[in-house]
Amino acid sequence: DWNNKIVVDVGAECGDTPLYFASMGAKVFAFEPLKKHFEFFKKNLSLNPTLSEKIIPINAAIGKDEQLKFYVATDDEHGTAAASFVSNNQGKNFKYELVDGYKLETARKKFDINHIDLLKMDCKECEFYLTDEDLKDIDRIKLEYTIRDKKYKLDDLLDLLKRNGFKCLIFRNGDRSRLSNRIAGNIYATKI
């Protein structure tokens, strides 16, 4: 039952997840940094006016309190797939897109988000900017992690979550060896 629950979606893209949780009764704060995705998101909201009343679309990134440079592909084949302010996943064919950024703690204060029932993150390494302070008053987290920069480690992310009272379950994205968990996957974390 998601009635009167608060969902924060970091990396909302076209808005499908916010629309789903709004249809289940939740109020959703949806952060999408990329202009192209945000325009599609707003279009989807306009096609669902009743549900859109429960969704607060925010054209910003979560990670750091500053203007962020996102690496975005310049060719149509890759579009905005895997765009990130943390790592260049685009190779040589990229451009920068400047985006307003907030630490999660700062965004919670700015948008008056006191308690989060579910934090959903799909943000291409921005999950590694989470802090102990960010994780206060959160019940559940579903995050997709991707590790491209070797300075980030899955164990560090799991330690942060466990230190803050979360029980974690890792789910692989595909049928690959367990070693692939170190590179990419999903973490489902529940406050215990």
Q: Where in the sequence are the language-model features?
A:
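Phosphate/nucleotide-binding beta-alpha loop and adjacent structural elements of enzyme active sites
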Residues: 1-192
